[in-house]
């Protein structure tokens, strides 16, 4: 986290990164202040000698039972879930939560990536490979069953958000800050604005990667998104 925090602060100090998002000027300093704070639980160090890297498909014997690694992406890189086929249990972490959706964001360090595409693919993988009667143990809220329906619901919810953006963009060319208010039409705290902006950018990157929209920078460097593509861009 400390290394990631330093990279984030470095990126934040590159003003054009925030200018492209069309953030208000005072928000720049507030973001740097948030990531510069040292009193967060996540700042605790993990030493290399207690870290063991896990990969998709690896199997571990834990307490006499075999657990298989199932990786997902989009919320965080290589998010590992643990699946026990014998007992029908999936420790899903943030990859499958019963009533809320994990944040899927573009971060300043990787602002051209397609995390939403990765997230939808990960939801499809869990839907198609884990039995529906599996007991899911999430990192938030209560255990649940019905993983396949829940994964499809998450997929459908993101496609509904994408359609909201498409409809809004057909009416006006907009910036990420404006589109955030289309997706999140309520008052947000400073950190929620960061998360909501990252999620809005993730949805726009999904459309950009599929050539449904394109990006234009104005004289200040703020990004605007015309929709649909003009003939010169096809």
Model-inferred region functions:
Residues 62, 82-84, 215, 227:
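Conserved hydrophobic "DFG−1" position in protein kinase catalytic cores
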Residues 54, 76-77, 219-222:
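Short acidic/glycine-enriched loop/turn segments that link adjacent beta-strands
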Residues 57, 64-67:
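Short coil/loop residues immediately preceding or within conserved phosphate-binding loops
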Residues 1-59, 145:
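Active-site HxH/HxHxD metal-binding segment of metal-dependent hydrolases
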Residues 32-52, 66-162:
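Metallo-beta-lactamase
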Residues 22-38, 50-53, 133, 193-213:
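Short flexible/disordered coil segments
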Residues 59, 72-74, 218:
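Short polar/acidic secondary-structure junctions
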Residues 164-234:
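C-terminal regulatory/interaction regions
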